[in-house]
Amino acid sequence: MQSVIAYLKQQEIKPLLRFITCGSVDDGKSTLIGHLLYDSQCLAEDQLADLTVDSQRYGTQGEHIDYALLLDGLAAEREQGITIDVAYRYFDTEKRKFIVADCPGHAQYTRNMATGASSADAAVVLVDARKGLLTQTRRHSYIVALLGIRHVVLAVNKMDLVGYDQQTFEAIASDYLALAAKLGINQVQCIPLSALEGDNLCKRSARMLWYVGPSLLEYLEALEPADVDLAAAMCLPVQWVNRPDSQFRGFTGTLAAGRVRSGDGVVVLPSGCVSRVVRVFNGDTEVHEAVAGQAVTLTLADEIDISRGDVIAATDDPPEVADQVTAYVLWMDDTALLPGRRYWLKLGARMVAASVSDIKHRVDVNTQEQRVAQRLQLNELGYCQLSLDAPVAFVPYARNRVLGSFILIDRQSNATVGAGTLDSGVHCASNVHWQPLDIDHVARARIKGQTPKVLWFTGLSGAGKSAIANIVDKRLHALGYHTFILDGDNVRHGLNRDLSFTVEDRVENIRRVAEVARLMVDAGLVVLVSFISPFRDERQLARERFAADEFVEVFVDVPLAVAEARDVKGLYAKARAGLITDFTGIDSPYEPPQHPELHLRADQGTPEQLASQVLSLLGVEGK
């Protein structure tokens, strides 16, 4: 029993190193990790037995063990002989514990590689000695640099296939050191090895006596990862407001930087309220001091409104607070990122609505060149400006990974669609404030004797939106209502004449119209908006500009065949002939509303009958 306790204590104090392996397809990443696991005797007997069987069934090494099969766990990976998902493995030696991520080499899985790199202390970049640096080598090295991994190993693999030639290794090492210098990677260890044969993997190889450096495992065991900067100003992202009873109110989270003691002055962000730390807890134990990386609970001297997602920070050098930020964004979804489209941005425990207001440039991660872009496709990286609905506290990623990284979440599916690293805040509008007005929208509506709202008519071209809206407008006007129609065609003659019909410009088209409609509702009007508005995200954006009872979505539904048969403007014929591109229903999608306030079947009634349904919904039909 004592030996077990001693072993567990030894495991507790062993330092942990997280590292990734990356590089081009078939450079031997999975083989390298598998051989490390095998040589470090971290495999159970049943795993060894399974490996022998799998090597015969799936292996690529003839009668020999195929170490890569320890990592390639998906059936698709084994059948294709490639890595698709990020495979995490744990192993340890007498000196250290390791968590290693085997990242896929194919370009289409760059998002997976970035996921693995986000928490790594070091990166092992593999290069095939026969091929030298390839496009994916440069791509992965750029992402390694972008994500702030400071320790990089260049593992020139398959040296057995070039006769363990020194000149081949030195030429590749020279090329990579030049690339690393360009990317700002300063700490690079170049190691020649053979993952298959085990040369320079766990111990020095007799086949390469010309190499005087450490083996890969020796280097990783001795590596000192970047220590948490305890000299940095204290930052605590609040994950939980801890109130076990009415006598105790603490704020719990993991310290992202610095150290904290009782008596320290703090500021709460983004509110800016100032207080003082009274007590510090690590778990249930009150402590004098806590440092970065520890989970803590703080109590403060003052009753301050603090919620999950707020940041408690030292007063001398607090994080920046902004609602406009610049960041590198790696797009991870099949549907492109579009400026103006709204997402959830999750930074630590804080969640705010956000949109990309501008893509400054797209980065060609193969060449590091900056290119003009109007959207970001899957696996593309862009330098963007983001607009947030509320200010957030952050630290640039180069200084703090926790408070400098975020993810973007699709508001409809809740899928993670992007990841980013924050660069700086944009304060171009920090001196712009709301001007208080004595006459508000309630007073304007009262004098008109009506309840202002927006009727948002959406549907395919030719569905009858404009005709129905026009009839509703005439009937409301006859009843003494103050109304205005914003029609899609008419607005494009003035306000939106600079916009095309690309997906990007359609997003901006709806954003502008929603803002104009909001101003008109504030003026006390009943606004009828007649736009195709094909995308749910943009209609949701419009809805969020209004109070819950001010927005009425009217879906004018008609089969595409019926709308195309009408074709009053001849647009469908032109789209079919290829004279018009990005035409809704033909080569651009229409996303029907899921829960409209009113669903009109436009092929089952006249415009007058359908208009009556709208008026009935408003409670004015028959007046």
From Swiss-Prot:
Top-level taxon of the source organism: Bacteria
SUPFAM superfamilies registered for this protein in UniProt: EF-Tu/eEF-1alpha/eIF2-gamma C-terminal domain (SSF50465), P-loop containing nucleoside triphosphate hydrolases (SSF52540), Translation proteins (SSF50447)
For the ligand (ATP), the binding residues are: G459, L460, S461, G462, A463, G464, K465, S466
Q: Does the keyword Phosphoprotein apply?
A: no
Gene3D superfamilies per record: P-loop containing nucleotide triphosphate hydrolases, Translation factors
Instruction: Give the stretches traversing the membrane.
Output: none
Known catalytic reactions: sulfate + ATP + H(+) = adenosine 5'-phosphosulfate + diphosphate; adenosine 5'-phosphosulfate + ATP = 3'-phosphoadenylyl sulfate + ADP + H(+)
Enumerate the InterPro entries for this protein: APS_kinase, CysN_GTP-bd, CysN_II, CysN_NoDQ_III, G_TR_CS, GTP-eEF1A_C, P-loop_NTPase, SO4_adenylTrfase_lsu
Q: Where is this region: G4?
A: 157-160
Q: Where is this region: G1?
A: 23-30
Top EC class for this record: transferase
To which pathway does this protein belong?
Sulfur metabolism; hydrogen sulfide biosynthesis; sulfite from sulfate: step 1/3; Sulfur metabolism; hydrogen sulfide biosynthesis; sulfite from sulfate: step 2/3
Q: What family is reported? A: In the C-terminal section; belongs to the APS kinase family.
Q: Which HAMAP family match?
A: Adenylyl_sulf_kinase, Sulf_adenylyltr_sub1
Q: Which PANTHER family match?
A: TRANSLATION FACTOR
Q: Which NCBIfam families does the record cross-reference, listed alphabetically? A: apsK, CysN, PRK03846.1, PRK05124.1, PRK05506.1
What is the stated purpose of this protein?
Answer: With CysD forms the ATP sulfurylase (ATPS) that catalyzes the adenylation of sulfate producing adenosine 5'-phosphosulfate (APS) and diphosphate, the first enzymatic step in sulfur assimilation pathway. APS synthesis involves the formation of a high-energy phosphoric-sulfuric acid anhydride bond driven by GTP hydrolysis by CysN coupled to ATP hydrolysis by CysD.
- How is the subunit organization of this protein annotated in UniProt? Heterodimer composed of CysD, the smaller subunit, and CysNC.
**What's the name of the protein?**
Bifunctional enzyme CysN/CysC
Q: Please give the organism.
A: Xylella fastidiosa (strain Temecula1 / ATCC 700964)
Gene behind this protein: cysNC
